[in-house]
Amino acid sequence: MKKSAAVVAGAIMALGMAAPAFADAGAEGAAVGSPGVLSGNVIQVPVHVPVNVCGNSINVVGLLNPAFGNKCEND
């Protein structure tokens, strides 16, 4: 029973780590409760850095790689 629980927990963790994270660059700031003109100035710049995360694998026999032949597209 313990082995099957460990296998189920491992599968749940593996699926959870495989889920993509969606985020967008944005800037939202506010200087709340500023006592004067020169205090509480807020400057924010949204930054978007495209990241290539597909096809970054190294192995000896490339044909046996599960990523072989997959298509990849960058944002």
UniProtKB/Swiss-Prot annotation:
InterPro entries: ChpA-H. Residues 34-74 form the Chaplin domain. One of its GO terms (biological process) is cell adhesion. Keywords: Amyloid, Cell adhesion, Cell wall, Disulfide bond, Fimbrium, Secreted, Signal. It is found in: Cell surface; Secreted, Cell wall; Fimbrium. Disulfide bonds join C54-C72. Its main location: other. Belongs to the chaplin family. Short chaplin subfamily. This is Chaplin-D. It comes from Streptomyces coelicolor (strain ATCC BAA-471 / A3(2) / M145). The lineage of its organism: Bacteria, Bacillati, Actinomycetota, Actinomycetes, Kitasatosporales.
